[in-house]
């Protein structure tokens, strides 16, 4: 977004929330989203152990490393929770304080019961036996704008 607003780039690849934020902050040159490259979330829920019978109810009372507050990945995660009757503010603890690029390392280091990861981090956690993909947010959310 910064490169587009500063004139360093003509087109940017980002989630729709970026243009919403800049609009709400009163940007003089409003960014317009004009194309959609994906229709589903591309991230995964990773657990500490294999869970072949995973249910979203398994997250109740657990700690999860989530995404940036207000970011599309976090919004999709919370949408799935609500769709499954889980209150994101009351039924579990979502840690949004860890930088996006550091959540897999934090999880490997013992933080939280679950983490939300994109590839290649989800597969890397499985390869090092630090975590197991138990759900696809893209499958469970359905299509997202």
Where in the sequence are the language-model features?
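Short beta-strand-centered segments that line the small-molecule binding cleft or hinge
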Residues: 11, 21, 30-37, 42
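Ligand-binding cleft/hinge of the Venus flytrap
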Residues: 25, 74-96, 111, 126-130
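Flexible hinge/capping segments at coil-to-helix
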Residues: 48-64
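Pocket-lining segment of extracytoplasmic ligand-binding domains
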Residues: 18, 49, 99-145
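Short beta-strand->loop
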Residues: 35, 62-72, 84, 89-100, ...
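Extracytoplasmic/secreted proteins, especially bacterial periplasmic and envelope-associated proteins
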Residues: 3, 8, 17-21, 58, ...
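Alpha-to-beta junction loops
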Residues: 5-17, 26-31, 62-64, 108-117, ...
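Extracytoplasmic ligand-binding site segments that recognize negatively charged/polar headgroups
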Residues: 38-46, 67-81, 101, 138-145
């Amino acid at each position: 977004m910064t490169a587009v607003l500063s004139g360093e780039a003509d087109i940017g690849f980002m989630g729709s929330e970026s243009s919403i934020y800049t609009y709400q902050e009163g940007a003089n040159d409003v960014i317009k989203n004009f194309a959609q490259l994906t229709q589903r979330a591309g991230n995964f829920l990773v657990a500490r152990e294999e869970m072949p019978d995973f249910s979203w109810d398994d997250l109740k009372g657990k700690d999860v490393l989530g995404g940036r507050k207000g970011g599309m990945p976090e919004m999709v995660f919370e949408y799935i929770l609500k769709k499954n009757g889980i209150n994101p503010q009351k039924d579990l603890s979502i840690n949004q304080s860890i930088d996006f690029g550091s959540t897999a390392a934090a999880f490997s280091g013992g933080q939280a019961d679950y983490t939300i990861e994109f590839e290649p981090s989800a597969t890397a956690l499985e390869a090092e036996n630090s975590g197991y993909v138990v759900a696809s947010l893209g499958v469970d959310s359905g299509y997202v704008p």
